[in-house]
């Protein structure tokens, strides 16, 4: 049988999620993993993620660098594991070196597809997960992280990629990956992008400018007003989804 050509994946971003994904992927020995990070000197070539049953994903990185030109041209797939506010600058950093690589984001609800269309162009090969595959927390930066939770099912949108692209991720992440019909289904979210502002409004809408004695707990002290605002925001969101022809479960269905 013909020898399988190993894919090279570049992870952009060195936080908890980047480290966990890099550990899981390199642990499979199915892919070569490299990391583009602002702090390469703080990274070990040997990394690990530990889940809450004690299972350890140990991996060895092929390369760690802060220079896109040293790491992007030889990569087949580029995966951004970054908070939303860093995605645009990261896309601009890698853009000069992107030829036909697949470029994606570990979560798409912060505007990845909109920014990638603008910066990489309409013919770029793009993919994005709807939600993150893991809950992650750093143990030691650049060395180890805790994998605190798995998702049973992942959803991905792709553009200009072959039909078997999701199947590769099923193999690498050992999790089912379903195909979304277009990028808006991955980009429009009534999860955190609505949940957080609704709760913040509930906490601060009547603030008088004084310093509080105690911290308000975000979830543990959740109140009726935050729920009412969240549900009202979702109703407006559902009207938008209906207009653009996108189906996303309502908050009341989902939670």
Where are these regions (language model features)?
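Rossmann-like NAD(P)(H) cofactor-binding subdomain of soluble oxidoreductases
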Residues: 77-80, 84-142
């Amino acid at each position: 049988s013909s020898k399988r050509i190993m894919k090279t994946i570049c992870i952009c971003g060195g936080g908890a999620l980047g480290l966990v994904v890099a550990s899981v992927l390199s642990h499979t020995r199915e892919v070569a993993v490299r990391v583009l990070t602002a702090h390469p000197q703080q990274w070990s070539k040997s990394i690990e993620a530990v889940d809450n049953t004690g299972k350890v994903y140990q991996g060895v990185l092929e390369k760690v660098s802060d220079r896109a030109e040293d790491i992007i041209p030889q990569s087949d797939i580029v995966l951004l594991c970054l908070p939303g506010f860093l995605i645009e600058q990261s896309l601009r950093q890698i853009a000069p070196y992107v030829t036909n690589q697949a470029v994606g984001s570990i979560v798409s609800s912060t505007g990845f597809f909109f920014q990638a269309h603008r910066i990489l162009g309409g013919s770029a090969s793009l993919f994005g997960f709807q939600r993150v595959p893991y809950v992650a927390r750093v143990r030691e930066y650049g060395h180890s992280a805790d994998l605190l939770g798995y998702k049973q099912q992942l959803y991905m949108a792709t553009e200009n990629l072959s039909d078997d692209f999701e199947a590769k991720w099923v193999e690498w992440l050992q999790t089912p990956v379903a195909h979304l019909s277009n990028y808006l289904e991955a980009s429009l979210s009534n999860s955190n992008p609505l949940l957080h502002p609704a709760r913040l409004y509930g906490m601060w809408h009547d603030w008088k400018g004084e310093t509080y004695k105690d911290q308000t707990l975000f979830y543990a002290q959740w109140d009726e007003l935050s729920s009412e605002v969240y549900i009202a925001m979702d109703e407006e969101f559902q009207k938008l989804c209906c207009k653009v022809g996108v189906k996303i479960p309502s908050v009341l269905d989902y939670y």
